[in-house]
Amino acid sequence: MAAGAGDRIALETSDEAYRQMDERRDLAAVTATINPVTGPVYVEGAEPGDALAVTVHEIRLTGHGWSIYLPGVGALARPMGAEMFVRKVPLDDAGVHVTDRITVPAAPMIGCIGVAPAGAAASTVMPSYPTGGNMDLTDARPGATVYLPVEVPGALLSVGDIHAVMARGESSFVAIEAEGTAVVSVDVVKGLRLRAPRIDTGDEIVFVGLGDPVQESIARGYEDAFAFLTGEQGWSAGDAYAVLSACAHSELGGPTGSTTPDPLHPLTPIGAVTLHRFPKALL
């Protein structure tokens, strides 16, 4: 698929892997791709050294989602134990029916969004990459624009892993996973060299930090915020330092890590994804 700057496209995603988990209750019996993405989309005019701006206009959900526990994965692995858990979660106009008693508003978002790296093929599960990937950030939602560094001609955008709702950080390693359609538009920002993704939510600029250990991830995210203020916005170093210290909030991002995991433990993250939020009202 090819798209030009400003084109709006609809990308359908699949939840077949979760259907199979529900039916078979055995991860080894799942034949569908886990965390599949739709794409790639070749964006005309995108070249290495540019940034691809992906604006999320709409996320259409189907009538259900999934709550999944994979044994040994996520922050709740110890209390959940060795048995797989799968729950089909109804979605309707009232919201997301997480339990029989608790219904919460839907807050659809894109868990996996990225462009092709210049090197080897990237995983759609973990880790997160400078070019994006399975970042699992609640900010990748309708109304936001995700900026991704382009490393290959055409950028080659892919999107997947839609969530009906997700707690920030996705500490359990899954959200309420859902099938759906993401409606996005693409633009090319010539010469905007990024070393990690950036998100404009409308109210904030969110800088994604990637590094190992977590302190390195935090430092890199803050450095990118500092470079944005002093380079793109023309602030003095002193002003940028003082305002970041006073007003830029940090938090953990998605749980997928920032470094390729040990092959013997492919779902154990290494490194960290962090987020650094700067209020646009201060620009």
Residue ranges and their predicted role:
Residues 1-30:
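N-terminal, Lys/Arg-enriched amphipathic/low-complexity engagement segments
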Residues 209-283:
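C-terminal alpha-helical interaction appendages
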Residues 108-134, 138-216, 221, 226:
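Conserved mixed alpha/beta catalytic, RNA-binding, or beta-rich assembly cores of soluble enzyme
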Residues 3, 43-46, 140:
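Short, well-ordered loop/turn sites that connect or cap secondary structure elements
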Residues 36, 58-142, 147:
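Intrinsically disordered, low-complexity linker/loop segments enriched in Gly/Pro
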Residues 11, 51-54, 148:
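A generic structural signal for residues embedded in beta-strands
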